[in-house]
Structure formats: C-alpha cells, structure tokens
C-alpha cells in the first residue's frame, strides 16, 4: 500500500487558499463591511402625508433636511417604496401639513411659488445643478431643455438635462414641468399622468 503524498496534498491546500484569498475574499469582506454599516446606520426618519388634488391623490414626504419627495396620481404603496425599508414613518405631522397647505393654495391659484426647505442630496451634482436652473423659471414661462443646457455651459447636454429632470423627486415645487422641447412640444413628464399632467400644470400657470 502506497503512503499518502502529504507534501503534494499540502501544496494543493496552499494553492486553494491562495485562490480564495484573492478577489473573491476581497468582495466578501467588502460585502460584510457594507452590511455592518447598513445595520449600524440609524434608520431614517420620514414624515409623510397625503391630499386630494386635481391630478389625483398627492403624497409628500419630509426628512430632517426638508421636503424630499412628492408624487401624485399613484397609489400610496408605490410612493413609499422609494424610501429605505427601515425608515421610521410618521403621518400627518405639522411639517407635512405646512407643505400640503402651500400645495392647496397652488392648485387653487392663490400661490405661484413655494417657500419650503428641500432635500435633493440623493441626486448627482449634475442633476442638482439642472434642478437649480429649473427653479429660476418663473410661473407662466417655459424654457427648453436646450436653454437649460446652455445655462449650464453644456449646450450639447439637452438629453442629459431631460434625464435629470425626469429624476426630480419634488415635482411642482421644483418646476420641471416648465421645461419643454425645442420644437414646442411638451416633452416628457415623470409626474402623475405624464404629459397630460404637465399640460394641466402649465395651463394653471397661464403658460398655455
């Protein structure tokens, strides 16, 4: 009977350890770190509320920095899906009621702009810069995607501008509906019923 090849077996084990200690182990270590950080981070605090609007049910949410989300014409569960599942939700708070009160005034024609702290920190720097420019468009006016790109010093970026506006988490308050295509067509709109909602808002403001 042959003796076991101990030296050869040890070499195989050493080689396997070498393979496992490479990229695979690094990925696993990074994943464990992310999971630990996720559980260590305090669950976000979010206040949310809803109201009936001419565009359907409207939902608003506030975090510690300010208004962070508005959606309308959809179901509440779809609205809540955008938040961290660990979020601590509080409904119908005073902070949310202030937002809803201003929105009611807007829909009734008593208000054309908003005085609210907002939080768009989850967006990229480019997306935030696009929304900052959109906030400069006065009620009753419309700008084109091209003009916003030019205002940013990137005249060829009209398509990325449209993509950034589509990710606006706070429609109406940040008036992405005031941006249209260069040919005069409305272009897209991520809020509510899409272009129909955009058309309704522009008519409310006297732009159409």
Labelled PLM ranges:
Residues 1-156, 204-208:
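Basic nucleic-acid-binding alpha-helical/helix-turn surface characteristic of O6-alkylguanine DNA
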Residues 156-200:
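Short glycine/serine-rich loop segments
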């Amino acid at each position: 009977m042959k003796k076991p090849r101990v030296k050869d077996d040890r070499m195989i084990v050493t080689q396997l350890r070498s393979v496992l200690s490479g990229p695979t182990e690094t990925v696993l270590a990074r994943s464990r770190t992310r999971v630990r950080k996720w559980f260590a981070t305090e669950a976000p605090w979010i206040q949310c509320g809803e109201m009936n609007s001419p565009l359907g049910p409207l939902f608003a949410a506030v975090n510690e920095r300010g208004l962070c989300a508005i959606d309308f014409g959809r179901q509440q569960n779809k609205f809540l899906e955008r938040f961290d599942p660990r979020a601590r939700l509080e409904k119908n708070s005073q902070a949310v009621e202030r937002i809803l009160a201003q929105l009611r005034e807007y829909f009734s024609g008593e208000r054309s702009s908003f005085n609210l702290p907002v939080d768009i920190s989850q967006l990229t720097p480019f997306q935030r810069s696009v929304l900052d420019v959109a906030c400069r468009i006065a009620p009753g006016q419309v700008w084109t995607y091209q003009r916003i790109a030019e205002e940013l010093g990137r005249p060829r970026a009209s398509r990325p501008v449209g993509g950034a506006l589509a990710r606006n988490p706070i429609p109406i308050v940040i008036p992405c509906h005031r941006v249209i295509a260069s040919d005069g067509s409305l272009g897209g709109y991520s809020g509510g019923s899409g272009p129909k909602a955009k058309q309704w808002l522009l008519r409310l403001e006297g732009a159409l």
